[in-house]
């Protein structure tokens, strides 16, 4: 019997100790939020957990996400700047998407430490890392939208795209996008603070009920409804155009990438946004009881952790799917990694570089990033 009880305790310990910048604002950290006796039966709702087990599991999990995401996005940045030289608007958006993921990822080591211990970095750093987390989160969403619009212009309005899709315009729209991401992150930054609670320090937002509702609605609009509308409209036009394309190989490659973008993004982030909405408005929806509250609390931790892993997938979807991008990556490793291991192969490197440069012209490169990245 004792062994049978270990698995549920193990799982519950992982779920209940996961750090969440968003969920604390809608649970026990709100000022004026639900108290243990606010439920209809008048009984206290004790959210017990096996915190030591979660403290063992979550730091390695966050660390793995950080390592894989950091390496993948740094490779994207190196290839875009060092090899592709940022020659198109698509390159600009891909670069900024990788930067968004890096901002998000840089906070994970600190949340890993927080999951195992109390918050020891002070109030200022609590706000700083919360800001980086939110800015990276919103920035990633907005640049996914810009990449979708960029793809739409390149395929559906190819003539207009020749004039509109410039590096200069890409830089301008990227700056505006970062400004919007900062403004979208302000509520989370302003209401977040570190305070002592039950003899240990925490870091999380302390929203009033009004701001809590506003934050949840804004997040669902910006990170779920808006991307969904843009993707449905743009990809409908893209698919209609591609199905008339005579180049069967190019058409299938582009369609595969488009569906990967849609499915992966919504697969990783839609569950979180739904649970966030249900948790915030559970009382209005008639779901205010201890059992449901516990299940939503656990679901919130799982879905946010799932969403956090999306930053590891972005380099694969937006960069490494492209055939010529993979060739650039291969050349980079052979020149800068393998060359240090084998310094007697200069002819091999020169032949590889000549072969790729002969197949990658400005026109073919632009077609690659426009259709298949």
Curated annotation (Swiss-Prot):
Induction: Up-regulated in the dopamine D1 and D2 receptor-containing neurons of nucleus accumbens shell after spinal nerve ligation.
Superkingdom classification of source: Eukaryota
InterPro entries hit by this protein: CCR1-9-like, Chemokine_CCR2, Chemokine_rcpt, GPCR_Rhodpsn, GPCR_Rhodpsn_7TM
Disulfide cysteine pairs (residue numbers): 126-203
MF terms in GO: C-C chemokine receptor activity; CCR2 chemokine receptor binding; chemokine (C-C motif) ligand 12 binding; chemokine (C-C motif) ligand 2 binding; chemokine (C-C motif) ligand 7 binding; cytokine binding
Extracellular side: 1-55, 115-127, 192-219, 282-298
Known tissue expression: Epressed in mature thymocytes. Detected in monocyte/macrophage cell lines, but not in nonhematopoietic cell lines.
Main localisation: membrane
Ranges of the Cytoplasmic topological domain: 84-93, 150-166, 240-256, 323-373
PTM summary: N-glycosylated. Sulfation increases the affinity for both monomeric and dimeric CCL2 with stronger binding to the monomeric form. Binding of sulfated CCR2 to CCL2 promotes conversion of CCL2 from dimer to monomer.
Gene3D superfamilies xref list: Rhodopsin 7-helix transmembrane proteins
GO cellular component, as recorded: dendrite; external side of plasma membrane; fibrillar center; neuronal cell body; perikaryon; perinuclear region of cytoplasm; plasma membrane
Record GO biological process: angiogenesis; apoptotic cell clearance; blood vessel remodeling; cellular defense response; cellular homeostasis; chemokine-mediated signaling pathway; hemopoiesis; homeostasis of number of cells within a tissue
Pfam family, one: 7tm_1
Localization terms from the record: Cell membrane
Record's bilayer topology term: Multi-pass membrane protein
Keyword terms of this UniProt record: Cell membrane, Disulfide bond, G-protein coupled receptor, Glycoprotein, Inflammatory response, Membrane, Phosphoprotein, Receptor, Transducer, Transmembrane, Transmembrane helix
TM helices/strands, residue ranges: 56-83, 94-114, 128-149, 167-191, 220-239, 257-281, 299-322
Modified residues (Phosphotyrosine): 152
Disruption phenotype: Following a stab wound brain injury, mice show reduced extracellular matrix deposition at the injured gray matter and reduced astroglial scar in the cerebral cortex. The injury site shows an absence of invading monocytes, significantly increased astrocyte proliferation and a decrease in extracellular matrix synthesizing enzymes. Following traumatic brain injury, mice exhibit markedly reduced early macrophage infiltration, improved locomotor activity, improved spatial learning and memory retention and increased neuronal density in the CA1-CA3 regions of the hippocampus.
Protein family per UniProt: Belongs to the G-protein coupled receptor 1 family.
Subunit structure: Interacts with ARRB1. Interacts (via extracellular N-terminal region) with beta-defensin DEFB106A/DEFB106B; this interaction may preferentially require specific tyrosine sulfation on CCR2. Interacts with NUP85; the interaction is required for CCR2 clusters formation on the cell membrane and CCR2 signaling.
Function field: Key functional receptor for CCL2 but can also bind CCL7 and CCL12 chemokines. Its binding with CCL2 on monocytes and macrophages mediates chemotaxis and migration induction through the activation of the PI3K cascade, the small G protein Rac and lamellipodium protrusion. Also acts as a receptor for the beta-defensin DEFB106A/DEFB106B. Regulates the expression of T-cell inflammatory cytokines and T-cell differentiation, promoting the differentiation of T-cells into T-helper 17 cells (Th17) during inflammation.
Name under which the protein is recorded: C-C chemokine receptor type 2
Organism of origin: Mus musculus
Origin organism lineage: Eukaryota, Metazoa, Chordata, Craniata, Vertebrata
């Amino acid at each position: 019997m004792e062994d049978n009880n270990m698995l549920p305790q193990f799982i519950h310990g992982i779920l209940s100790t996961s750090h969440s910048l968003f969920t604390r604002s809608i649970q026990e950290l709100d000022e004026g939020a639900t108290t243990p006796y606010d439920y209809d039966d008048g009984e206290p709702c004790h959210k017990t957990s096996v915190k030591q087990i979660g403290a063992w599991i979550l730091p390695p999990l966050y660390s793995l996400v950080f390592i894989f995401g950091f390496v993948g996005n740094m490779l994207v940045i190196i290839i875009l700047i060092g090899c592709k030289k940022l020659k198109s608007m698509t390159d600009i958006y891909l670069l900024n998407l990788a930067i968004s993921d890096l901002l998000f990822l840089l906070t994970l080591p600190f949340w890993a430490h927080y999951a195992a211990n109390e918050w020891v970095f002070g109030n200022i750093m609590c706000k700083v890392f919360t800001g980086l987390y939110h800015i990276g989160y919103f920035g990633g969403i907005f640049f996914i939208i810009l990449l979708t619009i960029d793809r739409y212009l390149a395929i559906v309005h190819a003539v207009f795209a020749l004039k509109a899709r410039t590096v200069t315009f890409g830089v301008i729209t990227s700056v505006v996008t970062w400004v919007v991401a900062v403004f979208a992150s302000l509520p989370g930054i302003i209401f977040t603070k570190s305070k002592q609670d039950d003899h240990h320090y925490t870091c999380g937002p302390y929203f009033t009920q009004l701001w809590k509702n506003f934050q949840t609605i804004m997040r669902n609009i910006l990170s779920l409804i808006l991307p969904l509308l843009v993707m449905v409209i743009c990809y409908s036009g893209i698919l209609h155009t591609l199905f008339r394309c005579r180049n069967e190989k190019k058409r299938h490659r582009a369609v595969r990438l488009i569906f990967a973008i849609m499915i992966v993004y919504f697969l990783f982030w839609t569950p979180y946004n739904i649970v966030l909405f249900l948790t915030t408005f559970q009382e209005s929806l008639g779901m205010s009881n201890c059992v449901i509250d516990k299940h939503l609390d656990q679901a919130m931790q799982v879905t946010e952790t799932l969403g956090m892993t999306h930053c590891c997938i972005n380099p694969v979807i937006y960069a490494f799917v492209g055939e010529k991008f993979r060739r650039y990556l291969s050349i980079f490793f052979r020149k800068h990694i393998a060359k240090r291991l084998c310094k007697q192969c200069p002819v091999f490197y020169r032949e590889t570089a000549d072969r790729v440069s002969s197949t990658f012209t400005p026109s073919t490169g632009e077609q690659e990033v426009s259709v298949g990245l």
